[in-house]
Amino acid sequence: MIQMQSILEVADNSGAKKVMCIKVLGGSHHMMAKLGDVIVVSIKEAIPGGKVKKGDVYKGVIVRTKTGVVRSDGSTIKFDKNALVLLNKQDEPIGTRVFGPVTRELRAKKYVRIMSLAEEVL
């Protein structure tokens, strides 16, 4: 579960390395974000020459969480780190590649583009 002030890694090649959650989108009482949710983030660490710079504010969709997700067959998928993919104003990925695995649950949230850019889909 991701809440405000949580630090996440960026799983794409947009140039950002670490981001901090500043708002969880989706209703007035939506306090925690889970896999596939959209959050507003601030860039905390970025590489020089990237598409984004430190201090910028973007939206991002969560692709990996430590909490994991329970599927309908009872299996659970958990990851070592929390990660997200940065989105632009039109809710399209900023980067052209997605590093690491993503889950099939993103398809139900209408993020098929992220799944096609990912190295592996679990």
From Swiss-Prot:
PANTHER family: 50S/60S RIBOSOMAL PROTEIN L14/L23, LARGE RIBOSOMAL SUBUNIT PROTEIN UL14M
Family stated for the protein in its record: Belongs to the universal ribosomal protein uL14 family.
Keyword Membrane: no
Pfam families, per database record: Ribosomal_L14 (PF00238)
Keywords associated with the record: Ribonucleoprotein, Ribosomal protein, RNA-binding, rRNA-binding
SUPFAM superfamilies documented for this protein: Ribosomal protein L14
MF annotations from Gene Ontology: large ribosomal subunit rRNA binding; structural constituent of ribosome
Cellular component, GO annotation: cytosolic large ribosomal subunit
Segments crossing the lipid bilayer: none
Taxonomic lineage of the native organism: Bacteria, Pseudomonadati, Pseudomonadota, Alphaproteobacteria, Rickettsiales
Gene name as annotated: rplN
InterPro entries documented for this protein: Ribosomal_uL14, Ribosomal_uL14_bac-type, Ribosomal_uL14_CS, Ribosomal_uL14_sf
Stated name of the protein: Large ribosomal subunit protein uL14
Role noted for this protein: Binds to 23S rRNA. Forms part of two intersubunit bridges in the 70S ribosome.
Signal peptide (UniProt feature, chain positions): none
Subunit structure: Part of the 50S ribosomal subunit. Forms a cluster with proteins L3 and L19. In the 70S ribosome, L14 and L19 interact and together make contacts with the 16S rRNA in bridges B5 and B8.
Gene Ontology BP, a term: translation
Parts forming coiled coils: none
